[in-house]
Swiss-Prot record:
GO terms for cellular component: plasma membrane. This is NADH-quinone oxidoreductase subunit N. The chain crosses the membrane at residues 8-28, 35-55, 71-91, 105-125, 127-147, 159-179, 203-223, 235-255, 271-291, 297-317, 326-346, 373-393, 408-430, 455-475. It comes from Escherichia coli O1:K1 / APEC. NDH-1 shuttles electrons from NADH, via FMN and iron-sulfur (Fe-S) centers, to quinones in the respiratory chain. The immediate electron acceptor for the enzyme in this species is believed to be ubiquinone. Couples the redox reaction to proton translocation (for every two electrons transferred, four hydrogen ions are translocated across the cytoplasmic membrane), and thus conserves the redox energy in a proton gradient. GO terms for biological process: ATP synthesis coupled electron transport. Its main location: membrane. Belongs to the complex I subunit 2 family.
Amino acid sequence: MTITPQNLIALLPLLIVGLTVVVVMLSIAWRRNHFLNATLSVIGLNAALVSLWFVGQAGAMDVTPLMRVDGFAMLYTGLVLLASLATCTFAYPWLEGYNDNKDEFYLLVLIAALGGILLANANHLASLFLGIELISLPLFGLVGYAFRQKRSLEASIKYTILSAAASSFLLFGMALVYAQSGDLSFVALGKNLGDGMLNEPLLLAGFGLMIVGLGFKLSLVPFHLWTPDVYQGAPAPVSTFLATASKIAIFGVVMRLFLYAPVGDSEAIRVVLAIIAFASIIFGNLMALSQTNIKRLLGYSSISHLGYLLVALIALQTGEMSMEAVGVYLVGYLFSSLGAFGVVSLMSSPYRGPDADSLFSYRGLFWHRPILAAVMTVMMLSLAGIPMTLGFIGKFYVLAVGVQAHLWWLVGAVVVGSAIGLYYYLRVAVSLYLHAPEQPGRDAPSNWQYSAGGIVVLISALLVLVLGVWPQPLISIVRLAMPLM
């Protein structure tokens, strides 16, 4: 197989991020300079984002048997790069007061971003597995980065052990699928899984084990038990990456698998996925009700958001609108999560003890940081799916897709889940405007809006509001990103 210049252009984001990893590694070996390495990482990620324009000019193509570059891959690559950029930006002020080595943080984020880009382009079960491992392994280190705090170390050990178990399920499932179908590429799976083949016990067992592995990575019920503890224990910038880049990349590749290989045609698999979606929506929202820790609350709410997305995935066979729904929903979820975790990051720093993640830390925030409180309010309203925010557009799409596919049970679950979610999101929003305590526990720097992290948070809030009122540009971009079969 020969690699042409066109192929290299198609792989530009992957190559640029890979090169940035090497440059940052050499820079760390040469001289430890926090500002320099953070800047190099941000420049590399920005260059990868810009390179997507050239990728678009090259058109859709299968670069290798393992990777397909098309509009779909470009959309998800862009979202992963945006989430990685935000993570690096939030991490800089957070790491300023960190006493141990700061620079490796950026290295690990870049390697995880590389895994996310590989997943966005994956067209084969081998690249799917490689991408998932490449995004998971750096996260073991990132989750435990504040290892002097007991919670962070505990979260890292928990995530490492459970993630390894989930990967073994995923790999065993792939082996069973290969034993039955004789191929691992998504397109060949689609051709080989002809009439009646999907009911073969070996194939059902294989896909069942793969659902266990992928369900863990996406923190779907009942494979979600690690989520709240890891979100709480991980440093705030890492929780940002876990909630956004990791979930978006893995959901993107699952979607492509379902698109090419008609896994959803099997009644048994559809029923299992419907039960998982129903349980994730209801359980995630109910568990979030009692939380007084914002990071745990966002952890449980992410379980319910993935449940909503699963509704659109189950409806994938009924038409293209469900792909549009997933794209719009994920963009809304990305910016809302970046804003919410960004506010937590701005309020936190390792030399002031654990992150500012208790609800009490935000009580009365409006009276001394009004703009920051307004941003947090917008993010909570968007996550709750209130009209005039981008979260509402995404949720409306999911409901429309559910109705179109006659998934009445799941539509009911989405409505009930959204009603429950409204309570705990508004509880966070209301606490920002209560009477401030005499001694405010935690506070953001007075010039937070001029810092890079503050600018990212403000842009996220602006996009959530503007695209919530006028979503047409986003819908057009998502439509362009439909994969060509």
